[in-house]
């Protein structure tokens, strides 16, 4: 009614593919606001009784009593996670107008599935993700799998670096929900995801870069993980302390200073508390298991 171009995202659309929308739990309603309409969208949301709670990165969070949460997105993907996927999903031309509406857009089945898997991969990379995502994969493929363009999907997933991740997650969904046989790796992957809760856990954010940095047959014990956590390599630190990259040679000499700043911030701001707790408790054998999981999924985000 306000003539604001928008696109319902993620669960706001996925829930309607379940036998009943009530079977698909959502913590919030995600909607992409196209173009320069964020201010107008804010006015409309506030008029409907929503109160702005927080502005973070690529979306604004609104809440309305008793507990309805709307995330108004100005971008479909987080630039800080992977620049390649951010650029891909910044192209809104793949969306089409919803039938009978002028200002509401949707992806066709293929592009919705690509975004669904990219969003899942982002969460897995940053915090791990739960097994509800496997149900989404199963439900979506049961409904649309037979009609989607497989060549298009293969090409797009390859370009986004998501081929291995998608194949493993589809396989795990079939094992879990259709009884397909699978190797021990998939039980390990399922157990890890089950332990992540629905939305992942902060302490799991250590695995993506740690598993990337270790050699295939390198050390897998807790000591190696602790050393990596307390003294991350230059390639990791430069992501969070960009001033190291102004002069790469000098930056590597300044790496100890960045480690010190990071340690002080961790103590003062309480950052990394759950990671440190995990380092104290994790069984050494599980470090090797998680290294294997992240290596096989091949999420090389930059």
Descriptions of predicted regions:
Residues 1-27, 33-302:
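Conserved NTP-donor binding/palm subdomain of two-metal-ion nucleotidyltransferases/polymerases, i.e.
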